[in-house]
Amino acid sequence: MGLEISTIAAIVSAVISSVSLAISLTAKQPSMDQQDYGVGINRRGQDNPILIPFGDCLVPCAQVYNNVNNYNTNYLAQLFCIGLGEVKSINQIYINAVPYFNNTLPQTIGWHTYKTSANFPNVSLGLKKGLPTESAMFNQIIQNSDGEVSANFRADGIASLSLLVERWVSTGGDNEIRFINPKNKVEALVSGIAVIDPRTDPNCLGRDDKSKRVWGSSYTNPACCILTYLLDPYFGMGLQVEDVDITSFILLANYADNKQLKFNGFVNQDSTFGEILKDFADSFDGDIYLESGLVKVRPIDVTASLVHLNETNRKTMQTLSLLST
């Protein structure tokens, strides 16, 4: 069964529509005109759409909570949303472009206490990959939140970062203490989410069953990343499997492996469908296109498929022609 005209229009021109929830964020419902208003932070924050990390990428972290302990103002607690989970690993945290960890490797999930970092000896932090059901909020944050944060702040399904800063005046040199101001640029280097690989899951059961999604070498493969985004009903376009030419994705996945092409980047849900798909296509220097009502992919050095016009797909081709002019 092919795509409906309304779905085709969404693929090529609509603004992205998906809702997300992160820690203390409240989701705003998307409207029928396919606009996404992101998520609203309940307290001391701003609107930030959740980011979807694919492959190995550096992700800007959105601060969702900030508090100075009322009884000991040396302590500053902050919570950050990294992006949609579950991510494969969190490899490094950067504070104002300075690395927190002494190596850039998959870091231990959990709490990292003071003196862990040579660059930030006064900063403790907690890492979560965004499991479907996460562990309770770190006690160190709860104890310095003046009763505002509870154990229920788990951040289910959200990769997150918790910071606890003990601020003191440096006596050992200018570089001893780098983190005092509560406003800092925080970024996370992550290996992103699991993907649908049509070579091992030709029926794309991973669309609705995330346990069928894989990492391995697939999580950086452009074909697998694109297919996951097209099919995922939560953060992606939510297409049905029958709307996609799976064979073309299998061919592209093998082509990308052979050419060592990778997709390493995050999807920003403030972007339009068209902008997101263009970025995906740029990663393998190819095309994402519609043919006979199906979404297909191809690298540009592969001979283009012929399009046979008939009454069934005439309107589809007219829509694409108008958008390409």
Could you tell me what each predicted segment is?
Residues 85-89, 309-325:
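Acidic, small/polar-enriched beta strand-loop surface segments
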Residues 4, 9-284, 291:
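Polar, S/T/G-rich
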Residues 293, 301-314:
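Conserved active-site-proximal loop/helix segments of enzymes involved in bacterial cell-wall
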